[in-house]
Regions:
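Extracytoplasmic beta-rich repeat domains
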Residues: 93-104, 134-155, 183-198, 236-284, ...
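Blade/loop signatures of beta-propeller domains
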Residues: 30-89, 247-260
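Bacterial N-terminal signal peptides that target proteins for export
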Residues: 1-11
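Beta-propeller domains
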Residues: 76-86, 116-137, 312, 325
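Repeat-blade elements of multi-bladed beta-propeller folds
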Residues: 61-65, 100-120, 145-169, 194-218, ...
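Short loop/turn segments that connect beta-strands within beta-propeller blades
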Residues: 125-128, 174-177, 226-228, 325-327
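Boundary at the C-terminal end of the N-terminal hydrophobic targeting segment
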Residues: 22-26
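Bacterial N-terminal signal peptides
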Residues: 10-20
Length: 340
């Protein structure tokens, strides 16, 4: 295994507020999927050239973190030190979901795509706050999703927007009307898998990881065909040999005071715990278009509070991992903390 040592508002002076209303979230709403289209959203086809050049695009926000480098750096100068103190709310948009919002809007030619908890998607006029369309996902029987019902946003590619769902699906919607085009089951939600991260669109593929590290899942990052929803590749964030090198120091050189002898005895007794070791990925990967590499950070091992039953370094938890964009093949990794 190789080590990774290095890795490489929009519509003007506008402040907006998007919030929930007092409408309760009921079971019948979870079981009903529907798209309400007030009028089609006037959006252009979002090309790969546009997505690749997002870092210098001061008109749109085409990625959750503004660009493939995930820097959140915006080069526009319309809002600056001299006028930021004068900004005032321009409009308020009320959703029908009473939960927190942890989403980043995607903005294309003045059309703002916003997600809410429990997998609603709204297309909104960024200038007026008026709704173009509203999609409600039909939720399956989910009882084990981790850490709340939040959703962190959509990806956009050509004429579609993409969202991961709490019941571990990837859905593709018509960017103009919100109509469901296809949906793909990513994993079994009853085994603890769920989706809250925003997908990433690149080179005709939709990249997405998974939640569920607290439920003993085996984490992954997967690529799906943007047109059909078919699986292109799968990378397990926990390899079949998760033991590693029995590291005694973390990435900063600090002694972790591991009892290696006790861990090796546990390995002999319990075996490699790779099938239930966790390793979720819920933040967007960085993409290097020149080298065709995808970089992502893998989360905690499972169970997170009892390391005695997961001997070894617990690869690739608590690590930065790089894979090939076209194939999903392992390139390198750097583990910050072994056996966390």
């Amino acid at each position: 295994m190789r080590s990774c040592k290095t890795a490489a508002t929009i519509a003007g002076a506008l402040i907006v507020s998007i919030s929930g209303t007092s409408m309760a979230w009921s079971e019948d709403k979870k079981e009903t999927a529907a798209t309400t289209t007030t009028r089609p959203a006037p959006v252009p086809t979002v090309t790969q050239e546009m997505l690749s050049g997002a870092a210098t695009d001061t008109k749109n926000n085409l990625h959750t973190n503004l660009n493939y480098d995930q820097t959140r750096y915006y080069k526009g100068k319309q809002i600056n030190k001299s006028n930021v103190g004068k900004l005032r709310p321009s409009w308020i948009f009320q959703t029908e979901v009473v939960e927190s919002l942890e989403t980043t809007p995607i903005v294309v030619d003045g059309v703002m795509y916003v997600t809410t908890s429990f997998n609603h998607v709204y297309a909104i006029d960024a200038k007026t706050g008026e709704q173009f369309w509203h999609y409600k996902h039909k939720m399956g029987p989910v009882t084990t999703y981790c850490c709340g019902p939040n959703n962190r946003g959509v990806a956009i590619h050509k004429d579609k927007v993409y969202m991961g769902t709490l019941d571990a699906k990837l859905v593709a919607l018509d960017a103009k009307t919100g109509s469901l085009i296809w949906e793909t089951q990513i994993a079994d939600p009853e085994l603890g898998y769920s989706e809250t991260m925003a997908p990433t669109a690149v080179d005709g593929k939709i990249l997405i990881g998974t939640n569920g590290g607290e439920y003993g899942i085996r984490g992954f990052v997967r690529a799906y065909d943007a047109e059909t929803g078919k699986l292109v590749w799968n990378f397990h964030t926990i390899p079949e040999n998760s033991v590693g090198v029995w590291a005694t120091h973390d990435a900063t050189g600090k002694d972790m005071h591991r009892d290696i002898a006790a861990e090796k005895a546990a390995l002999k007794k319990l075996g490699d715990p790779y099938k239930t070791l966790g390793g979720g990925v819920w933040q967007n990967p960085a993409v290097d278009l020149k080298t065709k590499r995808v970089f992502f950070v893998v989360g905690n091992p499972s169970p997170d509070l009892d390391g005695s039953i997961r001997p070894g370094d617990n690869l690739y938890t608590d690590s930065l991992v790089a894979v090939d964009l076209d194939t999903g093949k392992y390139v390198c990794h750097m583990q910050y903390i072994a056996h966390d």
